[in-house]
């Protein structure tokens, strides 16, 4: 498809979904890969004097691996539906303008309003302009996660449901099927299987709530991005994933590189009405490192087949999350 044809189809899709004539300006590709593309653009109406709206177009296809498919992943249309549900309960999700349909002839995807701000983790946890934001972000994370966990699972019946034991078993199967042989990883998976927490609630989860997947301004968190791993499961999983060292980007705070666990837990308890057991979250923080270690191996394996080196470089980092896992369970942090 030529660039001109793509532009015409995008304008037609906007007009179809909004009921208004649309003129697209400044279409730019922000990221692109084999299965996912993000573009930004401005849209105006028929009147040249009409204010433009800043938008984001997400295009993607769901790839299926019979082994990796045992862990949650949803389609672009399903992501958009979860974001709509999240916004209804007060979570700062992108405002969905349109969910693409076959008649739009653009592929799978959705269009949202664009939110200004910073997403790069290293800047968020280090730049002086975000110093005030860092003081409130752990509290904001607790409040946002409490809101996400209030989503009615009935609004997203397509979400995979997995408790902690199922997550551990799925990653055990991935390691076995890909024939990854690392003694440290074997020991970590055994620890996880033997320490599955009891009394797990079932809620909708973001699935990848962390620094780097949120838009931040000087006042704090403006928007939560990257909902493709949304699922139904133990809500403490979201809290633990936010705390793993990888997502601190060199920042000092154990929560995302910017805050304390105490602030996160207290805010979550106030907003949700549910108590937080630090040991329960600690399991998910520890197992989060195991999951990331498995992801590093998977990305490294796929990187061998690609031209770029980014995935291969991630594959070489497997020792980091495994070190963090053992450091955490031995309580040296």
Describe every region a protein language model picked out.
Residues 238-273, 287-306:
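Active-site activation/catalytic loop segments of kinase-like enzymes and analogous catalytic loops
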Residues 1-20:
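Juxta-kinase regulatory segment immediately upstream of eukaryotic protein kinase catalytic domains
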Residues 159, 275-287:
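All-alpha amphipathic helical-bundle segments outside canonical DNA-binding/catalytic cores
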Residues 28-164, 168-169, 173-188, 195-201:
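ATP-binding pocket architecture of kinase catalytic cores
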Residues 202-204, 222:
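Conserved protein kinase catalytic-loop anchor
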Residues 204-206, 211:
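Catalytic-loop of the protein kinase fold
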Residues 225-230:
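Activation of the activation-loop gatekeeper triad in protein kinase-fold domains
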